[in-house]
């Protein structure tokens, strides 16, 4: 699995925000935490989607680079090719979406946190189904859950730039349900879970679309009251990892 940091973040920060080593040791998976290159403001970033933060021809081809990271891991390690994933936070979550658009041939699933796909759902259509777990706080002021103006300005992208408009989490989910031909909204057996360690009780509602024919799932974990930075603990991280491992190619 790739684990991708957000804008201004780096691999060390991401590893502290969502540590995976103990789960990797327990469950026997490998993960890569690459670093994005620096932009003109000296902040690390990913050239992801038109919302955050790309795609731009004058920036590095991060999609190609991350595919090379995956291919390199396959050559060096014993990898279950049916269980290759991408996970990211914020700009890294958008980059996970970009990877699913571009590399649906190899990715089984993605788990973007507070990320977003292309604003125009017809800009790029993935060739193969990819399971999607989108996680988003309803109180996110940086990447608004319901869409609208983007609170962050990155290399000239700002709320005054139409390309910076945020696609709402539910609209984004429905786009991927359409890509995957997940026409059936299914009532999950477990409707709510506890995700954010600072919120009381079962703070997260699950919305799920299924395609029983190709066994593809598109799911939204809507964390009520959480901001841009969901506060994780060992158990909530385990829920995300278990979801990914339960959704092979």
Write out the residue ranges for each language-model feature.
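A solvent-exposed, charged loop/short amphipathic helix patch at secondary-structure junctions
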Residues: 143-164
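Acidic catalytic loop of the alpha/beta-hydrolase fold
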Residues: 140-143, 227-230
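Serine-hydrolase catalytic machinery in alpha/beta-hydrolase-like enzymes
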Residues: 1-85, 95-98, 102, 146, ...
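Short beta-strand/loop motif that positions the catalytic acidic residue
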Residues: 134-136, 140
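Primarily recognizes the serine-hydrolase "nucleophile elbow" in alpha/beta-hydrolase
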Residues: 74-130, 141
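Acidic, glycine-rich loop-and-strand cores that form catalytic or ligand-binding grooves
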Residues: 160-200
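Catalytic active-site module of serine/aspartate enzymes centered on a nucleophile-bearing elbow/loop
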Residues: 235-249
